[in-house]
Amino acid sequence: MVAGGLHGRTKRPQVGVFDGFMFLIGYLYSRIVHRADFVVEEGVFEDLDGPMIVVCNHTCGIDPFLVSAVMPRRVCWLMAEDMRVGWLVWFWNWAGVIFVARNRHGKSGIRRARTHLKDGGMIGIFPEGHIERPYGKLLPFAPGVGVLVKRTGARVLPVVIDGTPDVATAWDSIYTSSNARVRVMRPIDYSDSGLGSAEIANDLEQRFLDWTGWELGSRKTREVQHDELTDDVVQSISDDSRQIA
């Protein structure tokens, strides 16, 4: 455990031995089970100071683990409130998960996310709100991601994911091997862009379409895979963040 912790600390110098050990476990899981290929654009990890919103496309249930495995900073993921199940509470607490209710009560989670960003933290979000199905088609980005970016002034760190398991449920992806690829793109600063919330969401959506080369689907016409980890969180942000002064 000590060796693992020291290895993790070389990647994340600001964390303790236990956190470093957990990082090592996640990294080895990603590389062994999913044969993950981590591609980071030059200079990105030297430019991660300050508040940051990690924006990813959503391919399967293990996406947060893959992304966290490569990040030199802790990513606090936004998660649906009803995933706060008893036997996983210790893990969610350790991971710093920010729970967001699927209804009007979600504003407390959104407020916590904004506070975390104000304190210079990093949060992770999937603007599609659901897992992409059929595999290889991007779901429209919900406007909530633009609201969060606009209101906080945080920079966006785009992460493009592909090659993950095309399986029936989000949980199946945990033990199904794959050839995953995680691409960390350069941060985007929208603070002086003059774009509104909806325009920011649209701009991010178009960037991901360009990066993936995929087509844009529609929730109304296509089947989506239910994912309790992130389902409806972004829509909750869209609905509730407007009520927060």
Q: How should these model regions be labeled?
A:
Residues V2-V17, F21, S108-A245:
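Non-catalytic C-terminal accessory region of glycerolipid acyltransferases
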Residues K11-H34, V89, N93-G96, V100:
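Short hydrophobic helices that act as membrane-entry/anchoring signals
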Residues G26-H58:
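Helix-to-loop junction immediately C-terminal to a conserved catalytic motif
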Residues Y27, F65, G146-V147:
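Active-site phosphate/pyrophosphate- and oxyanion-stabilizing loops and adjacent acidic/basic residues
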Residues V33-R35, D49, P72, V89-W92, ...:
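Short, well-ordered coil/turn elements that cap or connect secondary structure elements
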Residues A36-V39, H105-G109:
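Glycine-rich, highly charged phosphate/nucleotide-binding loops
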